[in-house]
C-alpha cells in the first residue's frame, strides 16, 4: 500500500468526485437530448406554419400519448378562444418578429395550408406578483404526406414545461441554428 500525505489524499478524492460528477452530467445531457427528439432538420425546406394553442385533454403518459396529441391538434380549430387568445398573441408576437427578420417562415391560413404545426399545450396559469403567466409544453408537428406514406409526427418538443414566451424562444433559437441564421 502506498502512503500518501493527507493533502494528496484530499486532492485525489476531489478529482475522483469531480470526474464522477462530470460523467453523470454528460449522461444526463445525452438522455435529455434524446428525450426531446430534436429532428428539426426536417423543417429546413418547410415554410408554412400555423400556431395552435389550447389545453389538451390527453392524460395518457404511455406511448400512445404522442398519437393522441397529434390527433387532437389536427382536429382542433387553430383560432384560440378565451384565455388562450392572450397566450396565442404572446407567442405569435415572437414568431412574427422572427418571420420579419429572417423571412424563413410564413403564416398559413389554416391547418389545411400548413406544412407543420407549432402547438402549445397550456398546462397551467401561474400567478406571480399579481401577474399571470401561462405554462405548458411546446410541440412541433409535421403533418406528414399520405403520398409518401409518412404519418404526422412530433419532430421537436420542449424538454420541460415552460413559460410560453420562453418555450417559443427556445424553438426559435433551435430553428436559427438548424437553418444557419444568426
Task: Write out the residue ranges for each language-model feature.
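Short, amphipathic alpha-helical "lid/cap" segments that border enzyme active or binding sites
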Residues: 164-176
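A structural "domain/chain start" motif
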Residues: 25-97, 179-182
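Bacterial N-terminal signal peptides
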Residues: 11-20
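Bacterial N-terminal signal peptides that target proteins for export
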Residues: 2-12
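Short, flexible helical or helix-coil boundary motifs
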Residues: 19, 145-147, 179
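Intrinsic disorder/low-complexity segments
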Residues: 21-22, 26, 160
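Surface-exposed short loop/turn segments
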Residues: 89, 93, 97-107, 111-166
Amino acid at each position: 500500500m502506498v502512503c500518501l500525505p493527507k493533502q494528496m489524499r484530499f486532492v485525489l478524492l476531489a478529482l475522483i468526485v469531480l470526474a464522477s460528477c462530470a460523467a453523470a452530467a454528460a449522461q444526463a445531457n445525452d438522455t435529455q437530448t434524446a428525450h426531446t427528439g430534436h429532428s428539426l432538420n426536417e423543417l429546413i425546406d418547410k415554410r408554412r406554419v400555423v400556431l395552435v394553442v389550447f389545453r389538451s385533454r390527453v392524460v395518457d403518459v404511455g406511448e400512445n400519448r404522442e398519437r393522441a396529441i397529434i390527433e387532437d391538434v389536427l382536429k382542433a380549430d387553430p383560432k384560440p378562444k378565451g384565455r388562450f387568445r392572450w397566450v396565442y398573441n404572446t407567442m405569435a408576437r415572437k414568431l412574427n418578429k422572427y418571420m420579419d427578420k429572417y423571412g424563413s417562415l410564413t403564416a398559413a391560413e389554416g391547418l389545411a395550408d400548413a406544412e407543420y404545426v407549432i402547438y402549445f399545450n397550456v398546462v397551467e396559469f401561474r400567478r406571480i406578483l399579481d401577474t399571470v403567466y401561462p405554462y405548458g409544453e411546446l410541440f412541433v408537428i409535421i403533418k406528414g404526406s399520405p403520398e409518401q406514406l409518412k404519418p404526422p409526427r412530433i419532430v421537436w418538443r420542449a424538454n420541460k414545461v415552460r413559460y410560453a414566451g420562453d418555450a417559443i424562444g427556445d424553438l426559435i433559437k433551435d430553428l436559427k441554428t438548424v437553418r444557419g441564421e444568426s
